Amino acid sequence: MKKITTYQNKKVLVLGLAKSGVSAAKLLHELGALVTVNDAKQFDQNPDAQDLLTLGIRVVTGGHPIELLDEEFELIVKNPGIPYTNPLVAEALTRKIPIITEVELAGQIAECPIVGITGTNGKTTTTTMIGLLLNADRTAGEARLAGNIGFPASTVAQEATAKDNLVMELSSFQLMGIETFHPQIAVITNIFEAHLDYHGSRKEYVAAKWAIQKNMTAEDTLILNWNQVELQTLAKTTAANVLPFSTKEAVEGAYLLDGKLYFNEEYIMPADELGIPGSHNIENALAAICVAKLKNVSNAQIRQTLTNFSGVPHRTQFVGEVQQRRFYNDSKATNILATEMALSGFDNQKLLLLAGGLDRGNSFDELVPALLGLKAIVLFGETKEKLAEAAKKANIETILFAENVQTAVTIAFDYSEKDDTILLSPACASWDQYPNFEVRGEAFMQAVQQLKESEM
């Protein structure tokens, strides 16, 4: 990593003891900062707190007392999940204390080129594709995944060498806290309305996403989804070289034409060879192809890698086949748009959808067009009655109810026939029955595994 002196003897407050906060605290301590870590949980609820104390890092737990700011911190490194409306954070802004996120630290110490990926949907899948592509055809160095994908960016940046590529998934929450962060390649998969409770308005949300390119120059490349007019308009305001991708037209970049994927008129592969279904995954693949071509990955390696890629866990992930029924886990679909995208990749006449979850107060009328023609729908959770109303509007004849995901799998399997597909894509958050979407997805996969074992 780069040896920087920026933080020597500087008083820094790290807010939040999640993985990224612990990583940031340790890095700042190593760089000579006087670090205090603050977390809302009690000390005994933070497994890393004792380790930080042992290093000589001060730890304050059990709340975010505003009085902490009286200690005249020169910088705050904020966990992305802590909103700017938090009283301590709001007061820090009033006092004009600089606030950054951990990805800014990673960018400051990284020796290697950075590939940054953001967007409303498809970030994790695209980031994973890019990592696999860059590692498939390299002469030196390694593509190292980091950021919102689950690996603290500041830890990975310390480990990466100058020959590597730091491939970072970046959320809008993380991008709100960057100042000098400078990717050499940046990808925006798409922008839809999301996280307005955090950002306050769509304008602020878009601004956070667009911040990924604010330090880029004409020597850098910004890869944009040309299907979206909004991104075409924003493209006129960046200093970076713009490389588009599109499923609607041939562009000077990556595109879909007559069922085939191209890059600048160069044939890459048939779209139907992609290992994961859905029009949204064609977009993700095109974005990844752009990065791969910039990094000189061969067409043969691109085709082989994307054909073999079976998806990221809980994101239209192929789980297996039981008695000629195919099962897909899309538990990450925690909103209507994500489920619409998942459904676009399947033949509804042979599809049984498993959906439902936390009731956030919205109706599901906008999901109706995507539900048309479904063979059956199995509903669970707080929203099952609302989803049933949407299913009726879509003229779905078979509407079934289940207690939870596990029983939904059994009910769907019993109703299905050979060559059918059973898809978990809930269109809702999981918190009414499961602690997170991962646990919900694991429950689905375990139920499928039990079906497999029962036929042995």
From Swiss-Prot:
Give the pathway listed in the UniProt entry for this protein. Cell wall biogenesis; peptidoglycan biosynthesis
Q: Does the keyword Transport apply?
A: no
Q: Which GO terms describe its molecular function?
A: ATP binding; UDP-N-acetylmuramoylalanine-D-glutamate ligase activity
- Identify the Pfam families for this entry: Mur_ligase_C (PF02875), Mur_ligase_M (PF08245), MurD-like_N (PF21799)
Where is this protein localized, as stated in its record? Cytoplasm
Q: Which residues form the signal peptide?
A: none
What domain of life? Answer: Bacteria
Look up keyword Cell division and say if it applies.
yes
Q: What EC number(s) are associated with this protein in UniProt?
A: 6.3.2.9
- Which biological process, per GO, is one annotated for this protein? cell division
GO terms under cellular component:
cytoplasm
Which residues are ATP-binding? 119-125
What reaction gets catalysed by this protein?
UDP-N-acetyl-alpha-D-muramoyl-L-alanine + D-glutamate + ATP = UDP-N-acetyl-alpha-D-muramoyl-L-alanyl-D-glutamate + ADP + phosphate + H(+)
Q: What class of enzyme is it?
A: ligase
Q: Name the UniProt key words of this record, in alphabetical order.
A: ATP-binding, Cell cycle, Cell division, Cell shape, Cell wall biogenesis/degradation, Cytoplasm, Ligase, Nucleotide-binding, Peptidoglycan synthesis
Q: What PANTHER family is this protein classified in?
A: UDP-N-ACETYLMURAMOYLALANINE--D-GLUTAMATE LIGASE (PTHR43692:SF1)
Q: What's the family?
A: Belongs to the MurCDEF family.
Q: Function, please?
A: Cell wall formation. Catalyzes the addition of glutamate to the nucleotide precursor UDP-N-acetylmuramoyl-L-alanine (UMA).
Record-given protein name: UDP-N-acetylmuramoylalanine--D-glutamate ligase
Originating species: Enterococcus faecalis (strain ATCC 700802 / V583)
UniProt lists the gene as murD
